Each structure stands twice: as C-alpha cells, then as structure tokens.
Amino acid sequence: MLSTVNNNIVIALDAMGGDFAPLSVIHGAGFFLDNLVDPGIKVFFHIYGDKEEVSPLLLKYKKVSNNSEFTHCSDNVLANDKPSFALRHRKDSSMKAAIVAVKEGKAFGVVSSGNTGALMAISRFILGTLPNIYRPAIASICPTKTKSLALLDLGANVDCNADSLFQFALMGSIFAKIALKIDNPEVALLNIGTEEVKGNDSVRGAFELLKNAPGINFKGYIEASEFLEGNIDVIVADGFVGNVMLKTAEATASTFINLIKQEVFNSWIAKMLVGILLKSKLNKALTRFNPKIRSGAMFLGLNGIIIKSHGNSDAISFAHAIKFAVNAISENLNQKIINGVSHIE
C-alpha cells in the first residue's frame, strides 16, 4: 500500500546531502513538480535539513513549499564520514530523519545525494531487509548502444556468495520490468568468459541456481566487453566488480563524448556541417548517455524505497532521481520483489 497524504505519494528528501545541497534538492523538487510528474499522480515531500539554509529556498520555490512539510535537523552526514561513524554519531542528521520517516510510515521512500556508504548503513539498520532477502544491492540503469540495461550490485557488497548473486538476479529482473518496462528481461551473470566452467565459486554456484530457476529469463554469462552492446537487459555482479565496471564505462563514455565535441566542433565549418547533417542524430546519442537523466541508483532489497542520487547532482539530476523513486513506489516495486523471492527457503 502506498504511503500517502491526501492520496499523494510521499517522498522524504535529505536536503543536506550532496555537493550542491540544499539548492539542488529544493530546486530539483521544483523542477520535478513542474516538468516530470506523470498525469494522475500527486507527490508530496517531507523535507529534512537545516532551517537556516532551507527556509529561504522554500520561500523562493513556492510550489515546493506548498507541496511539502519541512523538519529542521541540527546535523548532517558529511561526504567523508565513515558509515559506522554516521550511524553512531549523526543522530539528528537530515539523512537519518528522512529514513526514519519511512520507518514510521510518514513517507514511502527517500531520495538523497549524500554519502553512499552512510545511506546504506543507516537504511539497513533502521529499515532492515525485505522478507527472504539476505543482502541489499545497489542497482542502476545504464545506457548502451541500442537500449538501457540494469546493472547490480554497484558497491553494497564487495564479496558475495552464490546465494546473494542468485537473489540479486531475481531482484534485478523485477527491477528491470519496472524501470525498463520489459515483460521478460534477459538476465546474465558477469564473468571472465561465457563457458560454464569459467569464473570463481560464487559465480559458478549462482549459475547453477539460476539455470533452472522459475520466473527468470536467465541467459548465462556475459563478458565485460559486451556491456555496451545492448544484448542483455540485466547484468549481475558482486559489488566490487560491478562498481569498477560501471565507473570504467562512465569514464570511457565521458572521454569519448568530450573527444567528439573537441574534434567535431573545433571550427565553424565543422559546426555548420554537423548542424546540417548530423545534429538530430548526435543530440539523440548524447541524450542517451546524459548522466542527468540517469541520476538515481536504487538500494534493492530494503524495507523501503531508497534512491541515491549522484553526489554532484544538480537540480535536474535530482529531479530525475525523485521521478525514479515515484515510479518505484507507484509500481509497488518492493511488493513485487517480495512476491518474486517468496519461493526461496
């Protein structure tokens, strides 16, 4: 059941998390309300932060103020806080208050640009995991040459056993159905080869669990070289490998895009030719890889919707992270995960 106020979907916002907070958060909430709300859906915010910094922004962004409730918090989690320190000592932080709001039923989900490790630690401590879920995983949507795919885990679990990878695959499949709107997503395990004998014990063990598992369209192994080809819908890895692969792919894409801009737009003649011949196709390709519209990573498996926006998110990026949360809530993602793993003993 959705957490609502007057039939609105309620989202808790950590106003102090991120490099450009609280402006990116409040402006982002305003951008979301103005541009990204789907017809028939109403969204209400619980905003947590420092009143001296947030209150002036709420006076400026009237639409946010009219669709929110603000709570002052005397502390905030810093970017360099260790998760254990944030959990024990940031008792009145905006991040913790937002998560507690979910625990108490005041909101159904949280959006934060704050410290990833702290957000996971506090969320797991306060909310716990869904029934039958051993470990939560961080999942995100990534662009490829032809379409988008879901990738998990992105850093929540450095070491994973076969059972955890198996659960990540189940959760990733359900996540992809909602986030990518695919009826029967194809799922693969990231490995150093496609042969069944390749990989470590955890990966091979997960393969054995998945190859005959009901309710999942498992396609075996995939190599990192195929990541951007768009031949699969969900890629599953442990948190160490997944995080390294994602950051490598992001850096490669960023370098390539900047190289294209540098080489193509280095003269007015090139700009004119591109404008005439390739502008629409180039803009379409650049939009597909635009990080602003893919700002949110989701903590799957927790007893509440938690969205982590990039630490350097601007208002537009944060707005898209809010939309990510709203979609997950409106589609009842967590209940579908519970149903999808209910057969696990």
Swiss-Prot record:
Record text on subunit structure and interactions: Homodimer. Probably interacts with PlsY.
Stated role: Catalyzes the reversible formation of acyl-phosphate (acyl-PO(4)) from acyl-[acyl-carrier-protein] (acyl-ACP). This enzyme utilizes acyl-ACP as fatty acyl donor, but not acyl-CoA.
Gene field: plsX
Protein name in UniProt: Phosphate acyltransferase
Record-listed E.C. numbers: 2.3.1.274
Pfam families with a match to the protein in the record: FA_synthesis
Recorded superkingdom: Bacteria
Record NCBIfam families: plsX
InterPro entries: FA_synthesis, Phospholipid_synth_PlsX-like
Enzyme class, UniProt record, top EC level: transferase
Gene3D superfamilies tied to this protein: Isopropylmalate Dehydrogenase
Chief subcellular location: cytoplasm
UniProt KW Nucleotide-binding keyword: no
